[in-house]
Amino acid sequence: FSATGDLLMTLGTPGEQGGGPKHFTSPSDVAIAANGDVFIADGHNANGNNRVVKYNSRGEFLMSWGETGYAPGEFRALHAIAIDPNGRVFVGDRSNSRIQIFDQEGNHAATWTQFGRPSGIAFDNNGRIYVADSESDNVQNPGYEMGIRIGEYETGWVHEFIRFPWANPNILPGNGAEFVTVDSEGNIYGGEPVPNPHINARTLRKYVR
């Protein structure tokens, strides 16, 4: 869409699931590179296409990479995609409890597990990465809990953790922030799309820096 809400482009075929350059199964996130290339995370659930699809700014298919699996370059329910200020593509491989990092041609560069089960990824201009984890618990990802982890996107070092503000963060996995962004003043916003075990269900929550 344009900044005024006008539809500019449609990718995929409405009402039809599938593979190839003209179909998706469950696109869950999108990232735009500095040159206008479009990267789509196609695989909201573990049985979807589980791939990253790349188009140019005119919507012309360029390439895709990934399939269902556990190895580097394979995914299970990729739920988030974002491009850091260095141009690297960060993919939230949620059901594998990891972030995979690629260059823009799909070459695998690194795998990080210290951010939990990533549902949303964002960056600021001060070297920080923000990762929303809405699913970690003692069953799905032992040793981790739901929350927003803040670290350094160059090194992967995690130095801050925002616990979700209800009494027991380990009940009802999937009910925390699934989407995260940050403003120019460092305030953090977490989108909570699923009913939570507190009165502020389905909300956008602001955490003041």
Q: What residue spans do the PLM features occupy?
A:
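Eukaryotic scaffold repeat domains enriched in small/polar residues
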Residues: 1-209
